[in-house]
Amino acid sequence: MGMYRGQIFGKKEIGLHWQAHKHAADHADDVGKENRMPVAICLGGPPPVMFSAISPLPDNLSEYEFAGLLNKRRLRITKCLTNDLWVPAEVDFVIEGYTIPGETRTEGPFGDHFGYYCLEEEYPVAVVLTVLLFVLLFCTCS
């Protein structure tokens, strides 16, 4: 999990802005340049999830565990529909897809969430397979 910027290129393509020193780049290296890498882009959700996504955690502590610690309860997760990834169950939207092996596009320029300005650079492209709206149902009894 991490917080990465995405640039919409069309109805089914998103540029994924991750730098070489981020975990997403490590995952892409593990998958290899010839293989698709599944992605799940989560939008919204509880503040502990967003905070854990940007926190520089040690490798032996997952972002999901840290979000649960911050929230004082286990984080509920659910499996994606189009791949084997797991996402927090309390996010608002999930965009599922995969990276296109070896394909990059020019992404940017943008200001990032740390307040810095990023110039145009080549970054991976994801193909969107589905967009899911998560609805939590609340029941009150009197």
PLM regions: where:
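Internal mixed beta-strand/loop scaffold within catalytic domains of large alpha/beta enzymes
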Residues: 1-34, 38-40
